[in-house]
Regions:
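N-terminal leader/targeting and accessory segments in enzymes
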Residues: 1-56, 60
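Phosphate-binding loop of NTP-binding sites
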Residues: 53-171
Length: 171
């Protein structure tokens, strides 16, 4: 109860297929982006793109709460830096931090949607596989502060070169 199901699509699944089941299992609403999955149930909401809608909702939620956010990125060391930063800040503040390494275009919005008015600061880990990824996550998150752990040559395939990695991490 109180949950919203977003019919996200993956390489091997189409979340739209599970919308009705999600409602049966207790979700309050199901967001779909294919008209074939809309029924007479008013709790099914048709949008142009479920992922974009999830990201927009997370951005809106972040703006409403308006608390400080620290964004963390880098070639490696993101998760450790996030955990250490969260542990230090938790000595004085009620902190929300990204769980594990859920640091992509889906994990970051889901983390932001966990923010409540009781939180005083958020630590958001941001990962990238391709140029533009960090820019997209920054637009959703609008961090007040940023930490770049380091920039290295790991995972060059998505960036083309070390310069591509550097450019992406500085987005």
């Amino acid at each position: 109860p109180g949950s919203i199901f977003f019919a996200l699509k993956g390489e091997n699944f189409n979340g739209n297929q599970f919308a009705t089941q999600a409602l049966k299992e207790g979700c309050s609403y199901a967001i779909v982006d294919e008209a074939d999955y809309v029924t007479d149930d008013k709790r099914i909401i048709l949008v142009d793109n479920c992922l974009s809608t999830l990201q927009a909702l997370a951005h809106y939620h972040r703006k409403i709460l308006g608390l400080p956010i620290i964004g963390i990125t880098g070639t490696n060391g993101k998760t450790t830096t996030k955990e250490l930063t969260a542990a230090c800040l938790a000595q004085k503040f009620n902190v929300l931090a990204t769980e594990g390494n859920l640091n992509n275009h889906i994990g970051v919005p889901l983390t932001l949607l966990k923010l409540t008015s009781s939180h005083e600061i958020a630590i958001i880990e941001m990962g990238a596989s391709h140029p533009g990824d960090i820019k997209e996550l920054v637009e959703i998150t609008e961090p007040n502060y940023g930490i770049i752990t380091n920039v290295g040559k790991a995972h060059l395939q998505g960036f083309g070169s070390f310069e591509g990695v550097l450019q992406t991490k500085c987005e």
